[in-house]
Amino acid sequence: HPNLYKNGKVCLSILNTWNGDSWTGCQTISSVLLTIQSIFTNNPLINEPGITHIHKDFYDYTEIIRFKNIVVSTLAVVNNSDKRYSNFQHLVKIARDDFLNNFENKIGIFEISKKEYELFKNNNKTKEITCSIYKMSCKIDYITVKSLFKLVKEKILLLDIDKN
C-alpha cells in the first residue's frame, strides 16, 4: 500500500506527513484509526497525491498488488511455506480453515481477477508487467497460481488426514 511502509510508518495528512488536512487537537485515536481504515480500498494508489484512474501506470500497479495479494496473503500463509509465519501458527490455522471453507468462492474471485487481467492485456498469456510507480514489476501467471491453489488445498487435506 502506498501509504504504509515496511518500517511501520504510516503516511497520512492528518499525521502531518503530507499536505492536506493536518492534525488538530479535536482528533482522537479513533479518528486516526478510522482514517487508516479508509485507505484500504481496491485501488490504494488513488490515495497518492497526483494519481488518478487515468494515470498510465494505474492499472498495472493495481494488477501487481492484486496478483501479489493472492500469491502472498493466501498461498504463502496457507501453505505455511515461509518461516516468518512460525510465530503465528494459530493465525495460520484460521487462514487454512478459511481457505478450505471458502475455496470455491476464492477460485471465483481468482477467475474474475484473471478475466479482468486478460481483458486489459488483450491476451491470456503469462506476461511480466512493470509499473514506473515504485519501480515494481511482476510476472502475472494466473494459470499456474490456480494450479497451486488446488495443490495447496490437496496438501492441507492430506495433512489434516495425517493428524487424525
Task: Please give the residue ranges for each predicted region.
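Charge-rich (especially acidic), low-complexity segments
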Residues: 46-164
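E2/UBC-UEV (E2-variant) core
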Residues: 1-44
